[in-house]
Amino acid sequence: QTNSNKIRECIEQGIPPDRIACVSFTRKAAKESRERVCRDWGIDERDMPYFQTLHSMAFRAGGYSSDEVIGPAEMREIGEAVGIPFGNKGRSDIETDFDTVGVSKGDFYMSQYHLSRSKGLSLEEMHRQLGDYSIDWSELKRLVSAYEDYKGVRKKIDFTDMISNFVRSADGPDIDALFVDEAQDLSTLQWSMVDVLRKKPRIQV
């Protein structure tokens, strides 16, 4: 049985759409779930606040503004300060920290840092596991330190921070049913967020 059939059953049982969460990894999957329910049931998207990506849910739960989220321009500024180049990516369509990463040296280094955080590993352990000797360990540490300092001073956050903060708060929305889409794509950290979401609903898929 597909998630959409199970969601249909929940609605038929009388569970209000705003008490059903369907979370996913990508915006595309979240949008498809929302549109399917809207089309089948004539429900307004605004009445389905929890059909969204995990990052969107963490963003909204934390009450953040888009100005607080670190983006490519800030990454270039950090790169200039430490002498490590970053690419010229724009801000559009960014929905994970990996989306801010391009193909330059700084981007390549940051992808290793984001990967370590998403897997719940130390940077050193991640570096050791990947065994990529094209990466200068001292340079990587210097960049990560500058990145975290910048966020602290400028009061900025990234997508991983949002999910980490959500997990730390251990307080999910008041819902009756939880559906997890694209489960195979979720990281260790994202599964920790799903564990928080699982605390209240009686129906879980």
Named regions from a protein language model:
Residues 1, 19-21, 93-179, 188-193, ...:
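Accessory N-terminal region flanking or inserted into the helicase ATPase core
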Residues 6, 36, 190-197:
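A short acidic, amphipathic alpha-helical/loop segment
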Residues 46-47, 199-203:
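A short helix->loop->beta-strand "cap" motif at the edges of active sites that frequently abuts
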Residues 71-97, 201-205:
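Conserved phosphoryl-transfer catalytic core
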